Amino acid sequence: DGRYWVMSGQRDYLESRYGLTTEVLVKYPEPHLMAWHEVPGKTPYPYQEKAKAGLLARLHARVEMGTGLGKSFILLNIARELGLRTVIMAPSTSIADQLYQDFVKHLGRKYVGAYYDGKKDFKKLIVIGNAQSLTRIEEGSPAWETMSKAQVFMADESHLCPASTLNRVCSGLLADAPYRFFFSATQMRNDGLDKLLDAITGPTVYSMTVKEGVDQGYLSKPVFRVIKTRSDKNFESDDANEMTREHLYYNTLVLHQAAEVINQSVERLGHQVLVLIDEVEQFTRLRPLLNHKTGFAHGPLTATTFHENGKIKAKGNRESVPKEYWESEPNKLVDQFNAGEFPILIGTSCISTGTDIRTVKTMVYLKGGKSEIEVKQGVGRCTRKVPGKTACSVVDFDVANIAILSKHAKARREIFDDIYGPVQVVDWGS
């Protein structure tokens, strides 16, 4: 009939850029307000109400809000107000699990199911899954037949999902879901597929940066300090990851300087201290330098395996970790840390994104790299505002005599400055 069909998220772009007239043929079912199972102990902030109103007015749209501004609370309220069959996708198991616990608490186990990490409770009104599990659902399977009938699709931290993964879920399993809402701290991409993401998510109807959240009194202010240090190792490699490992992760001087920051923050300032690391071995080397009780949040550890002749077949990471730390329940450890049961929490990527860490007043960032997404997600672990907390110190390290690491540190400083500058630089022996 001479008309073109496009992804519905492209509607605003086509109308504003080319002056085209579009027609929306999507049918939206009537909402059915759900009763609270347990009423939340807080009411939405005005900006959360604005974000929710913008999404519900547009029906297919996204919001961009800095980490710590309560995107998951908006998600919960939208799911309750619509009361329709809903699938919520998180980018990781840790984020999915946090959402699941919140939804079960406030809407009831009767209505909330989980589809991730081996859980396959997909027949509930609201199902929360992670991207990995949802993309593996085969067409025609019982899970597909049930979940493909969802009327609402919501994606939390949508920028952390590859655009191709998001497209597979939105155009496959959830192709018939009319209501579509996307939540993220930023929609920036590392994969160059920004236009595809825009077509999937639709227009941004509300945005608030971390700086805006701090200035308006909703977030704790991150105070950034970068310590210039050095490496005395002679190791050289064309592999930036290997250089980071040798000159930052396993740098004895950096580890001792980090330990000094951690111990002094606890002893002199009375701070709860969060340490973000990339590899288990960093914990193994840092822990003996710390003077206080420490929690360690990590994923499954692997044991070293051997050939019949006794030679190592595959080296694991469990043997280097004290046995008392072999088992880890990240969400439980975060709760204990928030409750003040121990003053130091060291964590790998399992807690660096989408984890509700509240009481941290000093964060030590030992992950290196230059990913804007990873750095901003890490900083987001310390911006939650709670009684008695208005600011959080963020400490990073610049191994100044190693060119590639100093280049990465410069990139992180620029990210810090963009979040909430200025950044203080302190020379501790470069």
Model-derived features: positions:
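Conserved strand-helix element at the start of the C-terminal RecA-like helicase core
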Residues: R85-I95, E246-L289, F416
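Post-DEXD/H (motif II) to motif III coupling segment of the RecA-like Helicase ATP-binding lobe
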Residues: V152, H159-V223, F416
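Conserved SF2 helicase motif VI
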Residues: Q187, T362, K370-V394
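Conserved interdomain linker/interface between the two RecA-like ATPase lobes of SF2 helicase motors
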Residues: M208-V273
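Walker A/P-loop
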Residues: R58-A79, I346
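Conserved segment of the helicase C-terminal RecA-like domain
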Residues: R381-R413
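Conserved Walker A/P-loop ATP-binding site and its immediately adjacent core
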Residues: S72-K105, R189, E279-E281
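Conserved helicase ATPase core of P-loop NTP-dependent helicases/translocases
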Residues: D97, Y111-F122, S141, L274-L276, ...
